[in-house]
Amino acid sequence: MNLQLNCKAVTDEILALSALRCATSAKSHRLITRDQLPGLRIIMRMVFAELMVELTGLVDTCNIDTEDPDPTLPYDDTTPLTLEVGLKNSDSFSPGMALTVKRQLEHMVAAGTLGWAATESDADFSRSLQNRREAALSALRNTLEENATAIACRPSCDW
């Protein structure tokens, strides 16, 4: 199953989490805005690459672009960002399950990116995001490994 992650979904989640943190925290925190998107996109690539390494053995192919074109101001997230992955043991997933896996990958990139960005300014928030990313990664790994086992156990009729 090949998935193209949606950069806008990732940045929307980053901005939403940042806004919710500012709105609900007793402490004052700086809001992440679209002005920081060029830097965030660099970190998004880094986090995506980390995920691909962490999923080694479960990834068939991956594709990542190397850089953004020269940003125009005001900067927006409509400039394509290539974050593609082909997952092993996933061809039998229903369309709904494929969308769920895609959304979880986008969530892991968003949580990892914002967690990385918040490390110095809000260590508790950063740890919380990293813990959520790790939990989602573990769940995805388990899902792909269980599906591989189910595929291996199916009887074959090659006659």
Put a short name on every predicted segment.
Residues 116, 121-122, 138:
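Mixed-charge, glycine-accented linear interaction segment located at domain edges/termini
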Residues 23-27, 113-118:
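Short helix/strand-capping connector loops at secondary-structure junctions
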Residues 1-98, 139-159:
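Conserved short "hinge" loops at termini or chain/domain junctions
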Residues 39, 105-106, 125:
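Generic detector of ordered secondary-structure context
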Residues 122-132:
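Short conserved catalytic/interaction loops centered on acidic-Pro-aromatic/His motifs
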Residues 103-116:
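Elongated alpha-helical scaffolds
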